[in-house]
Amino acid sequence: MNEVTRTNQVDKDFSKLTFKLSKHKTKKDKKYEDVSKFSTLHEAVNGNLQNFEMKKSKLQNGANTKKSDEKLKQLEEEEINYLLDTIPFIKEYDNKETVKETTDEQNTIFQIKSKNTNTNTFRKYLFHVEKINNNTTLDAVTERETIDQIFTCTCGGQMEVWITSTQSDLVCNECGLTQPYIETYTGKESNEGMAYKRINHLAECLNALQGKEGTNVPHEVVDAVKAEFKKNRISTTSEIKPSKVKQYLKKLGYSMYYENIFTIANMISGIPTLKLSRELEKRFKDMFYEIQEPFFRHKPPKRKNFLSYNYVLYKFAELLGEDDLLQYFPLLKCSKNLHNQDVIWKKICADLQWQYIETV
């Protein structure tokens, strides 16, 4: 085949594809719905592909008529179009699920996995492909452009959120740069939507506190932190605190394990991991939900971040008489900031008719 013939064939193929796409675009748009029957991207893709196969099998096993052939062809085109629409989200999901490997000077390999970003990918898929229109999917597709700037490191790497008990940090997956991550919101974002996000964050905090992060810590990391305690002549269990573990992880370049500070502290001290009863954990979450509206009502107009999660859980434990848990929720060291939180908390307690206990 000469060059001219090849070029003509390419042009013809391109014209056919363009025509098919134009037909696809002129089809009646699928109506938006409120709720999806799927809970994950994997489940959605598998479910839809199985549905296509069942429909095609039914047509193939039925009477072979011109009408059935046309329906089968149309169904195959719909399946192709579905895959074309879905592939970008599958790629985005897979990229976020890919295990990243970092090697230190001794060629020790540690596996790091981002756990917080794929939910957003699934929500965007639901909005664009499944046509699910609700608060969570809308929130996913209307993210501000500044979010991309926040989650991009100066070295070009991606900054990922790591939950450490009741605190979040942004950690670069390339150079390891760490910086505090403060959850903020604007007037455009609904209080209900932010409450949903905060409750999810609270659940992650409680999981981290109980060593239920779902991430295994390599023995090399635990041994390195243990060596730091030994170097600093810290041996008593009361001195092996999560805050110290975090300090040593940062020094050793293991900031990606911030979410495991309680687990590591327990592994070194030999103290069993804290376990909250289901009833108490549910009570914490219920109380947390109850304070959302009063907080929004009483927060200073210029305040953009929520109360410290440590502070909130400390107050919950205090109210419920769970004094043995107070040690797990270290409060802010700055008395002024602590007082500012007390001012808001006092108004929240008044609204909910809870007992107010002054912190400072």
Swiss-Prot record:
InterPro entries: Poxvirus_VLTF3, VLTF-3_Zn_ribbon. A zinc finger (unnamed) spans 153-175. Keywords: Metal-binding, Transcription, Transcription regulation, Zinc, Zinc-finger. GO terms for molecular function: zinc ion binding. GO terms for biological process: regulation of viral transcription. It comes from the Viruses. The keyword Zinc-finger applies. Putative transcription factor. Belongs to the nucleo-cytoplasmic large DNA viruses (NCLDVs) VLTF-3 family. This is Putative transcription factor B663R. It comes from Paramecium bursaria Chlorella virus NY2A. The lineage of its organism: Viruses, Varidnaviria, Bamfordvirae, Nucleocytoviricota, Megaviricetes.
